[in-house]
Amino acid sequence: MPSLLLVVFILQLLLHIINTVGANTVNELLWVLYNKLPTPTSGSAQRCQVLKQDIVRLKRELGNTSPQDNFSKWAKLDRQHNKAMAEYQKLDGSLRSHQATFTSAVSTVRWLGTQGLRFVLQFWFSRSPMFWMPAGWVPYYVEWILSFPRAPLGSVSINVWGIACASIISLAAEATAAIWVLVTHKPTPMAAEKQREKQEAMAFSANQKPAEKEL
């Protein structure tokens, strides 16, 4: 059986990762991984990606084709674009409905496996010492705080140990991020990825809105 000290530390590490990355990002990542597997929505998700690329390509070709100079080509591209957009919107609506159900289930499981497990451990082991401190090492009131709420006096409780783990993990993460920025002179990979995703979403929205007006 793993040490309770290690279990609490790993649990706090998972909570820190989820809070840093963001619950929505975790849900999106799991949704992408879910669609990589042979699931009921994997085919629709792959088709949506293909349609998304086709819409951007067709919109670009439409912009480069003059209806006055080459109307037949422009009309053909316009029909293809409208057809792809209609199919994409239909599939996207269906996928969003499935994703909402998936996200709700994942959020429940994630909460039970992190916050819920933490509450259970803190309640179940509230009277158990994580470890003992040398006698007389700290004043009485410090011993009382470290054993809060119900651990034996002179020991460190699971609540205090969890707080200590969370603080150490947070400080280590901030130090690592600061060193990364100082050494590479670049934003952290997480910040760079969020910026890239934001730019891609804005680019697709810019291509989609004019098409909706044409419809």
Curated annotation (Swiss-Prot):
Pfam families: CHD5
Keyword hit for Membrane: yes
Keywords, in A-Z order: Coiled coil, Endoplasmic reticulum, Membrane, Transmembrane, Transmembrane helix, Transport
GO molecular function term, any single one: protein-membrane adaptor activity
Region (Disordered) location: 192-215
Side Lumenal, residues: 1-4, 132-155
GO process terms (BP): tail-anchored membrane protein insertion into ER membrane
Keyword Endoplasmic reticulum attached: yes
Signal sequence annotation: none
Family the UniProt entry places it in: Belongs to the WRB/GET1 family.
Entry-linked PANTHER family: GUIDED ENTRY OF TAIL-ANCHORED PROTEINS FACTOR 1, TAIL-ANCHORED PROTEIN INSERTION RECEPTOR WRB
Function: Required for the post-translational delivery of tail-anchored (TA) proteins to the endoplasmic reticulum. Acts as a membrane receptor for soluble get3, which recognizes and selectively binds the transmembrane domain of TA proteins in the cytosol.
Protein name: Protein get1
